[in-house]
């Protein structure tokens, strides 16, 4: 086994290197504290691998994203969201009978318990759909208390199917609640994405015809968001799951992590930026100059990524989808033109190129969601719907991993040294 040696004040420590199929290897530091009395210090876990995983591979420098070895470009073009969900969950692409069975199982469990309607009634009308989604995901576990054991394979299978089936229903209910419209039951003759669109935008008074182009584009966007290695929300799902919390509780925690604007709110921020540019007369070059001069309020949103130091491979796919979707609209959205002009100017400017600031997946997704009719507060919910199979797959992998331990990071203490208590009257 390859080792690296660390010289420290007390001597030298040999540490094993965990090799990777692709990408960086990991230095095993499990004996570091015991042998040296010191810990690693890595705010944000930028250089820390908390697990080994066989699900998603990213090469940020080369702009590569693969699910279970399959390039994201191929999956987005040729696959479907439920097929990709199967791939992430079980490790291989399904045969036709396997995919049919998987789809049918999900379809049969799309209905929510009737008592959940009273649960939704407890939220104020202006409740953010992400808060409702997180609460409801946790709450539905109370209806299945006999099948929550994370170490029972049958329980895990049922929890997997129930989450995949019911989260779109919850998401549509959260939206309907916010606009004061009645909740629609699922229509199981429809496909997964078509059913979600109907529950979200349909009304009982008239039939709702799902636009097949919009359904396919949303299905593709779900694929692009399905997993992304050990990001904030996925790491949260794993961390909570490491305590042996059930799948519902762990995914609910992941939803809350995604709710944070630094993680799930970027596409909304892009729209707000484009609105600002348009309100100021549509002068993109002037806006870019203000960004470079670091003027107050001028921030380039939708560019750059924590991992990708090249063009986000998902962004290329989303850009084409945005052009297709918005090109079908009777009135073209001027913000698409602004976005494309901004991208062109930024990619030709050494200021941004030298800083490796390239468009990410969020740069165009907000425009597509807006064109479909979703309000901005639903954007992060759509992100969560896409990320759901990734959270499930990562949780299942973590539960089966013999190296899994309850997550318990260390700290470098910087508080007060020991001091004696002073009675209140003497202070």
Feature locations, PLM:
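Non-transmembrane, aqueous-exposed alpha-helical and coiled segments at domain scale
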Residues: 1-427
């Amino acid at each position: 086994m390859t080792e690296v040696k660390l010289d420290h004040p007390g001597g030298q420590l040999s540490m094993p290197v965990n090799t990777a199929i692709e990408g960086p290897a990991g230095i095993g530091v499990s004996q570091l504290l015991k042998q040296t009395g010191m810990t690693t210090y890595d705010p944000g876990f930028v250089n820390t691998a908390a697990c080994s995983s066989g699900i998603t591979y990213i090469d940020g420098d080369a702009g590569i994203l693969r699910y279970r070895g399959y390039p994201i470009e191929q999956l987005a073009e040729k696959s479907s969201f439920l097929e990709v969900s199967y791939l992430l969950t079980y490790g291989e692409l399904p045969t036709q009978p396997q995919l049919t069975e998987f789809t049918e199982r999900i379809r049969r469990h799309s209905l929510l318990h009737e008592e959940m309607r009273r649960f939704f009634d407890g939220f104020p009308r202006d409740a953010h759909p992400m808060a409702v989604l997180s609460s409801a995901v946790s709450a539905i576990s109370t209806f299945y208390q006999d099948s929550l054991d994370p170490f029972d394979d049958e329980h895990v299978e049922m929890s997997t199917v129930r989450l995949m089936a019911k989260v779109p229903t919850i998401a549509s209910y959260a939206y309907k609640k916010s606009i004061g419209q009645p909740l629609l039951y699922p229509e199981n003759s429809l496909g997964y994405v078509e059913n979600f669109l109907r529950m979200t935008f349909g009304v009982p008074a008239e039939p709702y015809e799902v636009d097949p182009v919009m359904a396919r584009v949303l299905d593709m966007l779900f694929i692009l968001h399905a997993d992304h290695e050990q990001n904030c929300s996925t790491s949260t799902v794993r961390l909570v799951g490491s305590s042996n919390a059930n799948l519902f509780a762990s995914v609910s925690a992941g939803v809350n992590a995604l709710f944070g604007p630094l993680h799930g709110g970027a596409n909304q921020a892009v729209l707000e930026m484009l609105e600002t540019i348009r309100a100021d007369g549509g002068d993109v070059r002037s806006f870019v100059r203000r960004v470079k001069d670091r003027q107050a309020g001028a921030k380039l949103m939708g560019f750059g990524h924590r991992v990708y130091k090249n063009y986000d491979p998902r962004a290329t796919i989303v850009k084409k989808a945005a052009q297709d979707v918005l090109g079908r609209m009777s009135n073209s959205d001027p913000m698409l033109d602004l976005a494309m002009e901004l991208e062109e100017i930024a990619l030709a400017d050494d200021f941004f190129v030298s800083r490796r600031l390239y468009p990410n997946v969020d740069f165009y997704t907000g425009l597509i969601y807006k064109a479909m009719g979703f309000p901005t507060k639903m954007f992060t919910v759509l992100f969560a719907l896409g990320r759901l199979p990734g959270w499930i797959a990562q949780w299942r992998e973590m539960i089966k991993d013999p190296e899994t331990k309850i997550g318990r990071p260390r700290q470098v203490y910087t508080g007060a040294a020991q001091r004696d208590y002073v009675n209140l009257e003497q202070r």
